């Protein structure tokens, strides 16, 4: 965290894959410090999501509730699996946006149906278009496949420009 103010640092990465849990009281002081540092330096906090255990959206979603009023929170992998995708695209992602939370996401590792469904939900609800960005999770991801699915889902118009360029620029430039 002491390097957070160095030139070129744009984000802090947070994962619970190796231990800890957002709702563990012993973790809360550390989380407070991480998010306070991010706020002080205007950094995004990347939060890794995956199905089940401590990285499940039901756990890491608390970070959005607690901190995304003042810090941009990037939920990597849009919930990390089918259950997370359904919970987020079904309403939670949009509920957070409506509540004023600074929540962003990418669709790396997204299950095949999600990009199209999410694009339709964004269109239907009229919000969220500026909260989704392209990411490929290289070297583990499928760049060509993820790019193609997202390009097809966004249709190459304004939503595509935001997803592939403008939202990233807003967060990280």
Language-model segments: what does each one mean?
Residues 127-133, 141-173:
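Mid-to-C-terminal alpha-helical segments outside catalytic/metal-binding sites
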Residues 4-5, 65:
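Ankyrin-repeat helical core positions
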Residues 3-4, 12, 38, 105, ...:
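Conserved, mostly hydrophobic/aromatic
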Residues 1-4, 90:
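Short, acidic/polar
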Residues 10-11, 24-133:
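Catalytic pocket-lining loop regions of alpha/beta-barrel enzymes
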Residues 15:
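Conserved residues at the C-terminal ends of beta-strands
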């Amino acid at each position: 965290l002491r390097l957070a103010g160095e030139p070129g640092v744009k984000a802090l990465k947070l994962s619970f894959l190796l231990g800890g849990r957002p709702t563990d009281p012993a973790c809360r002081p550390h989380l407070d410090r991480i998010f306070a540092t991010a706020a002080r330096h205007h950094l995004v906090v990347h939060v890794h999501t995956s199905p089940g255990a401590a990285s499940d959206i039901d756990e890491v979603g608390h970070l959005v509730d607690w901190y995304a009023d003042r810090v941009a929170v990037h939920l990597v992998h849009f919930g990390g699996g089918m259950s997370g995708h359904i919970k987020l695209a079904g309403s939670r992602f949009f509920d957070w946006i409506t509540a004023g939370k600074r929540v962003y996401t990418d669709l790396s590792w997204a299950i095949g149906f999600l990009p199209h469904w999410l694009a339709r939900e964004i269109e239907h609800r009229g919000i969220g278009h500026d909260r989704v960005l392209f990411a490929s999770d290289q070297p583990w991801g499928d760049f060509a496949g993820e790019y193609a699915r997202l390009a097809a889902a966004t249709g190459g118009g304004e939503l595509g420009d935001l997803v592939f360029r403008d939202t990233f620029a807003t967060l990280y430039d």
